[in-house]
Curated annotation (Swiss-Prot):
The modification Phosphotyrosine is found at residue 67. It comes from Homo sapiens. Changing residue 139 to A: No effect on NEDD4-binding. The gene is GRB10. Residues 290-399 form the PH domain. The modification Phosphoserine is found at residues 104, 150, 418, 428, 431, 476. This is Growth factor receptor-bound protein 10. The GRB10 locus is imprinted. During embryonic development, the expression in the brain and spinal cord is from the paternal allele, while in placental villous trophoblasts and skeletal muscle, it is from the maternal one. Expression is biallelic in most other tissues. Paternal expression in the brain is maintained throughout adulthood. Imprinting often is isoform-specific. GRB10 is unlikely to be responsible for Silver-Russell syndrome (SRS). GO terms for biological process: ERK1 and ERK2 cascade; gene expression; insulin receptor signaling pathway; insulin-like growth factor receptor signaling pathway; negative regulation of D-glucose import; negative regulation of glycogen biosynthetic process; negative regulation of insulin receptor signaling pathway; negative regulation of Wnt signaling pathway.
Amino acid sequence: MALAGCPDSFLHHPYYQDKVEQTPRSQQDPAGPGLPAQSDRLANHQEDDVDLEALVNDMNASLESLYSACSMQSDTVPLLQNGQHARSQPRASGPPRSIQPQVSPRQRVQRSQPVHILAVRRLQEEDQQFRTSSLPAIPNPFPELCGPGSPPVLTPGSLPPSQAAAKQDVKVFSEDGTSKVVEILADMTARDLCQLLVYKSHCVDDNSWTLVEHHPHLGLERCLEDHELVVQVESTMASESKFLFRKNYAKYEFFKNPMNFFPEQMVTWCQQSNGSQTQLLQNFLNSSSCPEIQGFLHVKELGKKSWKKLYVCLRRSGLYCSTKGTSKEPRHLQLLADLEDSNIFSLIAGRKQYNAPTDHGLCIKPNKVRNETKELRLLCAEDEQTRTCWMTAFRLLKYGMLLYQNYRIPQQRKALLSPFSTPVRSVSENSLVAMDFSGQTGRVIENPAEAQSAALEEGHAWRKRSTRMNILGSQSPLHPSTLSTVIHRTQHWFHGRISREESHRIIKQQGLVDGLFLLRDSQSNPKAFVLTLCHHQKIKNFQILPCEDDGQTFFSLDDGNTKFSDLIQLVDFYQLNKGVLPCKLKHHCIRVAL
């Protein structure tokens, strides 16, 4: 029977040897292996009358002395992890002895006594120093549970490096030049970062905010896809590059209005000879189909400043140009760029930096390129609609169904949250009714004639109130500072004194969708304003002129036929009514300070 917790070397301790030598042979247990002594005791009946109480007291004293000896030698005697005991003397190799050494009953009792846990742990720590070569090593199947240096509870320091949550600081700029440093995780996507910035900036989350990868030294920029990892994209950017926080209403416009994007002559299918525009979306999202976008583009030669107009074909395998007219035979197609390890960008100032023939340039940039312009594949379209078509086709062919999932995720979240949250009431012509609050309780005016007269009366009352406010707010007759002439400056859609080119640039950056607008000061008339509006991917400007009626200044878009006391009323009206405009005002350009 092995001693649980106490090595056999305790038997060689002087204190223990003294106790063993002082013990008389007549007090040994009859169950011991010493048979001659047992037979002598049975023969002599006089020796059976042993004082039992004295024997028990002697055994208890021996146990107490042995326990103190274990405590004294626990720091020096090793205990192997495999359950075997380290001997003070190495065991001699050879055949096993036929005669086993006699074990006294007192030793058998002492071997069943426990030792302190701390002493055993200290003995285990010194195992490697006292392990002998004659004892075979038994591997421990659970070293992390019983090892002295590995606690059973996982701590952040005990996690492997791959599982540790890495954090990184990312600097994001706004359109007005302000910036914010945000600490993000390594697995944070562009959508997650946009939602975080929306929360920190107290903006309205309408799923149109995007993160823009901006390269000023290359004159390139693009909107990150919602599923892209921000840290991974930043690793491919140069030191001059930066992230911009911007609106983009046209990011998923293709899924809303696919009919308005691709002309019929630009779309072909390899597997079917004819197909309608309604099948366009399914063919782009289906990985087994092979849609193609074809047409003429201006292509800049690598390493040269010259541009050539070539017939270009975009497939899932890459972008090709034809070396012989409009032929698409394999021997006439030359690979221009690969879609797998590249991204498509818009040219910011293509005419000035790359001598582009038009202002509608695009670029296919390999991910490995940082500052060099030699490997950039620069292209140029004839108009903005053609450029949008090529860039949208590139994204669809590269990402496919993943792009559609990015479009559907916000809608699915909105549908799940709608039963638990009160929806914001949309302002439209179908959600407004005429009310009469002249009595003690309000009532709905159902008669159209009565509703029209009530609206006219309310309009006259509003004009009278605004006139009184103008009179009270005027500082001097020469420099009137009325509320109606300055209240619009508090709105996000008013951008102040910017040029026509700047307003067009802002409209293009935030998406050429129908109804996107902004208001600005007129450069030709100091008292007038300009409404810049996008319709059918074209930008138009409408002048807002002031007019006077009964000494009161009004603003009008249609030469005084429809008058408004301030620009806020004008914008509210044309958000509900098209009027003289080609479409209603739907989205306004906004700049947010981070």
